[in-house]
């Protein structure tokens, strides 16, 4: 379906959200020499190999990673994109060395926020024990609403991932199909209750955030 194709291809939604998300290049010849960069498929990435198949210090490394990803059975069918690496507020790192950041996942329907939660659910307990589990941000909420307005009519049920940079700015990291996304730390009862209400009675979501 057109809605899934739109949200599953970064190049499709990038034009609508380029003011809110990291600079991206879809042709290697357009990538500047100075990095760092993130290299991924237009839909998926090799997060499990962050240090050698996702993060690139410069254009040469980005090209080398792109060549490897073009041989990947899944990513080669999507096309490869190079994105500007934005340093994010970081609490830890996962087993691949990928930064565990101040990032949230939002489930949204028809331009309204249904529910939101911390993205890195595998680290929730350790961050809570350390007293650094992040709180929700009004600024992040407003960013999501701006993004939803810009993609209005393109997709109904969408996931928006946002994160905070070290400079204190919130940015859109990714869009995903709401039907195919993990729930992270999003409260399930709240999500499914509001999703049901939104589908049964579109007038029940009177506010931007239930």
Residue ranges and their predicted role:
Residues 2-103, 110, 115-116, 120-146:
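Active-site nucleotide/adenylate-binding loops and adjacent lid/helix of ATP-dependent enzymes
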Residues 38, 157-160:
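A short linear hydrophobic-aromatic micro-motif
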Residues 98-101, 153-157:
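Short solvent-exposed loop/turn micro-motifs enriched in small/polar/acidic residues
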Residues 103-105, 159-161:
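Short, surface-exposed charged micro-motifs
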Residues 108-112, 165-168:
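Short acidic-glycine loop/turn motifs at beta-strand connectors
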Residues 138, 150-155, 164-210:
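C-terminal active-site "lid" helix and adjoining low-complexity regulatory extension at the edge
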């Amino acid at each position: 379906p057109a809605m899934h194709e739109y949200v599953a291809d970064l190049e499709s939604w990038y034009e609508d959200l380029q003011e809110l998300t990291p600079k991206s290049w879809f042709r290697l010849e357009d990538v500047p020499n100075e990095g760092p960069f993130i290299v991924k498929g237009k839909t998926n990435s090799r997060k499990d190999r962050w240090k050698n198949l996702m993060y690139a210090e410069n254009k040469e490394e980005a090209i080398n990673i792109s060549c490897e990803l073009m041989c990947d059975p899944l990513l080669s069918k999507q096309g490869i994109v190079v994105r500007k690496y934005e340093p994010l507020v970081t609490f830890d790192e996962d087993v691949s060395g990928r930064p565990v950041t101040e990032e949230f996942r939002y489930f949204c329907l028809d331009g309204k926020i249904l529910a939101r939660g911390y993205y890195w659910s595998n680290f929730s307990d350790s961050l809570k024990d350390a007293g650094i589990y992040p709180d929700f941000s009004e600024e992040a909420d407003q960013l999501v609403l701006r993004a939803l307005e810009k993609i209005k009519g393109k997709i109904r049920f969408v996931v928006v991932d946002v994160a905070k940079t070290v400079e204190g700015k919130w940015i859109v990291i990714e869009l995903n199909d709401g039907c195919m996304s993990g729930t992270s730390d999003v409260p399930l009862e709240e999500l499914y209750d509001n999703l049901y209400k939104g589908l049964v009675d579109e007038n029940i979501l009177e506010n931007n955030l239930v």
